[in-house]
Amino acid sequence: MAMAMDRIVFSPSSYVYRPCQARGSRSSRVSMASTIRSATTEVTNGRKLYIPPREVHVQVKHSMPPQKLEIFKSLEGWADETLLTYLKPVEKSWQPTDFLPEPESEGFYDQVKELRERCKELPDDYFVVLVGDMITEEALPTYQTMLNTLDGVRDETGASPTPWAIWTRAWTAEENRHGDLLNKYLYLSGRVDMRQIEKTIQYLIGSGMDPKTENNPYLGFIYTSFQERATFISHGNTARLAKDRGDLKLAQICGTIAADERRHETAYTKIVEKLFEIDPDGTILGLADMMKKKISMPAHLMYDGQDDNLFEHFSTVAQRLGVYTAKDYADILEFLVERWNVETLTDLSSEGHRAQDFVCGLPARIRKIEERAQGRAKEAAKNIPFSWIFGRNIRA
């Protein structure tokens, strides 16, 4: 559906993007996606059964000018020599069984008993955050699908030999271990309702994600740079909390996953660094565009069949525990601005200079807004039941 628009207004829901002005350079190819679900209305239409609990929004497609496809073709040699070095050979990689009780061992039951004893020291709110992180990792099919929507770098055949396609498949293979490991650990812990968790994973993969990357690899790689650092921080903090509570094995697990995320973050930031080198104006415009729309978390369409605001509630608990906070969001942006030398960019268009000023000033603005929001959040705190922990209430 093609349509002209000066401004798109979205729902005021906490995790729906704020209004942003459509630029003239954008493709006119957009599609409307209705994402409304009522928890109390039984829906018989098969398609509607899988629509996530979000408001109507507009999806922009293929916003990158076709002439810029050549940039990514020309970078294949660089990707082969630089990007792929951030992958680890399978034979040198850790596997989930390295951290779990050994089922073939005579001591298996004792090992499981020890694991469950350690987990007794961990509070319910910690498990809510750990489960949310695990569910996010388990939706990996969606993330590989997202990368393969990006023009110029997608895997065109499913087994393409281009370095971009090799990276996507191998990155996915490395990430696949994260959800596997956390899932098995949580299953053995006996502290969580695995059926509700499994339902949430199925709902989430079926719902997909809406990162607003528009098939545009500039936007896509900016998004992944931000997200990999966010997951590095989140897993690092769950490791710290597990250590504080005496579960050193779980701390090791979360720390190992965090190390993978840090390596992947470095790879994606290298791509964007290269884009800034080749096309500073186009890249700064892409960065400003993504920040105006706000970076959504990859599991923002999370649903368990009961709570239409599940992701918001999970995020609130993560914020309260200090696992992933609005301060982290601002810190990540500030880190990337410094990493990519955004403040010192030259040879920009007037629009590029405005984008540069916006991005460089944004971390301070986010922090000011967050300070005010924290006061309101404390006043509005309430108990929220989480199906993942058998319906027990958590302060959020």
Curated annotation (Swiss-Prot):
Q: Which gene encodes it?
A: S-ACP-DES5
Tissue expression: Ubiquitously expressed with a preference in leaves, flowers and stems.
Q: What are the names of the required cofactors? A: Fe(2+)
Its recorded reaction(s) are:
octadecanoyl-[ACP] + 2 reduced [2Fe-2S]-[ferredoxin] + O2 + 2 H(+) = (9Z)-octadecenoyl-[ACP] + 2 oxidized [2Fe-2S]-[ferredoxin] + 2 H2O
Has the keyword Glycoprotein been applied to this entry? no
Can you say what this protein is called?
Stearoyl-[acyl-carrier-protein] 9-desaturase 5, chloroplastic
Q: In which pathway does it act?
A: Lipid metabolism; fatty acid metabolism
Q: Give the CC-aspect GO terms.
A: chloroplast; chloroplast stroma
- Induction: what does the entry report? Positively regulated by LEC1.
- Return the cofactor note field: Binds 2 Fe(2+) ions per subunit.
Q: In this record, what's one Pfam family?
A: FA_desaturase_2
* Reported function: Converts stearoyl-ACP to oleoyl-ACP by introduction of a cis double bond between carbons 9 and 10 of the acyl chain.
